[in-house]
Amino acid sequence: MGVARREERLRALAEEMRRSSPDSGYRVCDLSDVAAFVDLLERVEEEHDRVDVLLNIAGVGGVIRTEPVTAESFRAVMEVNFVAPYAGMLTVLPGMRRRRFGAIANMSSDDARAPGPGAGDYSASKAALSAATESLSYDVRPDGVFLHVVYPGWVPTEMGLAAVSDGGLRMPPRAVRRTEEQVSSLVLRRLGDPRLEINAAALPLVAPIMRTVVPSAYQWMRAKQ
């Protein structure tokens, strides 16, 4: 079941999914409306008797801001990137725990672990999602439910391309670039794995270490990006 706000793209996605899963479908929902997203998940679970896998991929932001972030814009980013996926988890987890089976993957960002200039709202929202997912994973793992935080590297999605074309971000090095197919294949392989993190690229793992070991050099490099 695909969920997104643009029906035309959802329709195309559903057609592709039906090639391998004939019963695939879609629902239109804007995740900025958290209550509507929760209601949708409840209806899907009621209609299909269960939700075994939830992939929270939707996101907004990721561009370098030149103007000050307002409380309203910060809240809007947090609603889509953190509140909606967290509410989605809380909606489907009771059923997963009763059945002692389930997996949830939440799309984070390397900016959550190593935030750069001009994107504090995006980085904060992804950091909140990563932290909340890890904390909750300890509670549900004994019930056979596994939660994952996905760090995809840089992917040429619409949002990723916008960030480098007019969003103020330099093209990331080749070592951290990944395709949508590479990331999705990795996530599918790792769903249900005991490991919390799903890292598509190894290089970003060095950033938090550099920040601790050589903080001055690290901050200088981040400020230049």
Question: What are the residue ranges of the model-derived segments?
Answer:
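C-terminal helical subdomain
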Residues: 149, 170-207
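Residue(s) in the substrate-gating loop at a strand-loop-helix junction
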Residues: 109
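Active-site helix of classical SDR
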Residues: 89, 125
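The beta1-alpha1 cofactor-binding region of Rossmann-like NAD(H)/NADP(H)-dependent oxidoreductases
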Residues: 28-39, 71
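Conserved glycine-rich Rossmann-like NAD(P)H-binding loop of the short-chain dehydrogenase/reductase
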Residues: 1-12
